[in-house]
Amino acid sequence: MKWSEICVHTTQLAVEAVSNLLHEVGAQGVVIEDVEDFDRMMAEDHFGEIWDVSDRETYPTSGVHVKAYVPASGDFQDLLSNLKKEIERLRTMLDIGSGDVTVAEIDEEDWAHSWKQYYKPVKISQQLTIVPLWEEYTPQPEENVILLDPGMAFGTGTHPTTMLCIQAIENYIREGDHVIDVGTGSGVLSIAAAKLGAASVKALDLDSVAVESARQNVETNGVGELVQVDTGDLLKGVEGEYDLVVANILADVILLFIEDAYARTKSGGRFITSGIIGEKRAEVTNALVAAGFEIEETRVMEDWVAIIAKKG
């Protein structure tokens, strides 16, 4: 089987939007090549992907490459044409850089190697490291490993918003806590909470593919008895109270259910939310305070913000 590698040259600002476009045309995951991210990871001695310095040679010297792999089928040219139109439409809304699109055809065996080479073990927090399923990895004493298949959609734990959220969970979770994860995606936050001592975790997502992805990842990590994954539209219809409510989703979505999050958080419990771009920080903060939360801590990584809000 032949595969087509689609590569879009863009800016850091447009990475998420371009990634979404690639998902819409059928990509099950994307690869992001950003030399600034690479240099930052190499400079840090704490958290991030475990790379070899020689890997830098494959990265663009400027801008960002967003790559996706789709089957080389008869309708590929139509797919490509639609993608280019959407990229040009995107240009009217934000700086996408050159927006150049290149295509390469590769064989099945090369495809398997091409996308796997981009995924390395990621030290996500003091205690947790995310490891691709195919990697042989020996954890250090007291290090917890989360196994994920990066070929599946909905995130691999390497994005700053996920790192911020997991680090906050690690800092605030207590043994025996009950946790709810809103918009679980790959289930990585739920798995992290379970491995960090939660007594139970309820994971919700509106997307049926995300629900199936999360269920598979939960079972792979041996936390099926602790984590229940269900289809759910934010916190609609959810009853009971939780020690931790966590959500790594965009700010505009967070704003839709802050009052519900307050209602579902136990007194003394916390709402940990990430996925907030810097320019939305004040708006989300004000909405949290208006709902009755006290802002306990705000964490920043690159242009992303995580807010830890406590219910008195």
Curated annotation (Swiss-Prot):
This one is known as Ribosomal protein L11 methyltransferase
State the Gene Ontology terms under molecular function.
Answer: protein-lysine N-methyltransferase activity
Alphabetically list the UniProt keywords: Cytoplasm, Methyltransferase, S-adenosyl-L-methionine, Transferase
Q: Which GO terms describe its cellular component?
A: cytoplasm
Source species of the chain: Exiguobacterium sp. (strain ATCC BAA-1283 / AT1b)
User: Which Enzyme Commission number(s) are on file for it?
Assistant: 2.1.1.-
* One Pfam family in the UniProt entry: PrmA
Main enzyme class: transferase
Q: Which domain of life is it from?
A: Bacteria
Reactions that this protein is recorded to catalyse = L-lysyl-[protein] + 3 S-adenosyl-L-methionine = N(6),N(6),N(6)-trimethyl-L-lysyl-[protein] + 3 S-adenosyl-L-homocysteine + 3 H(+)
Q: According to its UniProt record, where is this protein located? A: Cytoplasm
Hydrolase listed as a keyword: no
Q: What biological-process GO terms show up in the record? A: methylation
For the ligand (S-adenosyl-L-methionine), the binding residues are 162, 183, 205, 248
Query: Which InterPro entries does UniProt cross-reference here?
Result: Ribosomal_L11_MeTrfase_PrmA, Ribosomal_PrmA_MeTrfase, SAM-dependent_MTases_sf
Q: What does this protein do?
A: Methylates ribosomal protein L11.
Q: Which family does it belong to?
A: Belongs to the methyltransferase superfamily. PrmA family.
Q: Which HAMAP family does the entry mention? A: Methyltr_PrmA
